[in-house]
Amino acid sequence: MPGLLRARRTDAVRLDAVTTFHLRHGVEVADALRVGRPVVALESTIVSHGLPRPDNLRVAREIEQTVRDAGAVPATIGMVAGQLVVGLDDAELTRLATVDDVAKLSVRDLAVAAATDADGATTVAATSAVAAAAGIRVFATGGLGGVHREAAQSFDESADLTTLARTPIAVVCAGVKSILDSGATLERLETLGVGVVGYRTRRFPGFYLTDGGFDLDWSVDSPEQVAAALAAQEQHGLHSGGLVVANPLPTDEQLDPALHDRTLAEGLMLLRREGVTGKAVTPFLLAHFHSATEGASLAVNIRIILRNADLAAQIAVASAARQA
């Protein structure tokens, strides 16, 4: 396939029925996978599209350090010059954080991006698929994509959901982004057979908010319980999909609910007025939150991803211990 580069630590990996990609592993990640050390996958979209500069690069490094501090190896995934990299080094991370034309890559975009030697940041869907193909079972992100509001008219639903239906990975998140339809997203996850467990809660979190307003059937109380669930899934062989681990913010760290609701209503009105659709919806609304809350939402967003990175690392450590 044109545009694919070969470098150290390169493996051919089949992501679907028709396309074979070459994954280049960072040295630290390759060594960790070889000897069975715990590894946590991290997305790169938060670096290139999710956070403003210069916070994006600083926070990306903090996320990786949080994973290390909890005993695991971070594997930030992205595409550099057409090649999928599992474990971006600091120069590659800096490149995706500072270059202006970094593409936002879901699973469907990977082939064309590779063929055109593109730089790209992977979404939850693409990161999950690549991580699972590389043998990584735990992934930390901020919020899951989901069913958009008014999806009955727009059919706008994140590929995160259908990808998780066929991808064996645990995704630690603070629920779905509160700009989405949480109830409809939970219904779709149920239909698709994707497990959802609350971490020390029976309520689905609302990203910026501790409580998103919906009950959950299952709750786990420790990283070891999540690791046991992943092991049972693999051993029983009854389901090859993902597991959403919903990790809510403590109530004293959430965004003020009244401010959240007011900002969301204003953002949705602006969205309709300006005709924003598709991939542009989420970054548009997140930017509105950042502006309207005078940076408060950004601070909450950063706390979310750091807390999720820490929990994901603990789960990866517990999973590795079970296999030792």
UniProtKB/Swiss-Prot annotation:
What positions constitute the catalytic site? 43, 177
Subunit record text: Homotrimer.
Free-text cofactor note = Binds 1 Mn(2+) ion per subunit.
Query: Which SUPFAM superfamilies did the record assign?
Result: Indigoidine synthase A-like
Binding positions (substrate)? 104, 124, 158-160
Family per similarity comment: Belongs to the pseudouridine-5'-phosphate glycosidase family.
Q: Please cite one Gene Ontology biological process associated with this protein.
A: nucleobase catabolic process
- Organism per entry: Salinispora tropica (strain ATCC BAA-916 / DSM 44818 / JCM 13857 / NBRC 105044 / CNB-440)
Name the keywords, alphabetized.
Glycosidase, Hydrolase, Lyase, Manganese, Metal-binding
Taxonomic path: Bacteria, Bacillati, Actinomycetota, Actinomycetes, Micromonosporales
Q: What is its EC number?
A: 4.2.1.70
Cofactor(s) the protein requires to work: Mn(2+)
General function of this protein: Catalyzes the reversible cleavage of pseudouridine 5'-phosphate (PsiMP) to ribose 5-phosphate and uracil. Functions biologically in the cleavage direction, as part of a pseudouridine degradation pathway.
Q: Which GO terms describe its cellular component?
A: cytoplasm
Q: Where does Mn(2+) bind?
A: 156
Superkingdom, according to UniProt?
Bacteria
Q: Does the keyword Metal-binding apply?
A: yes
- Write out the catalysed reaction: D-ribose 5-phosphate + uracil = psi-UMP + H2O
Q: List the InterPro entries.
A: Indigdn_synthA-like, PsuG
GO MF annotation: an example: metal ion binding
Q: Which cysteines are joined by disulfide bonds?
A: none
User: What name has this protein been given in UniProt?
Assistant: Pseudouridine-5'-phosphate glycosidase
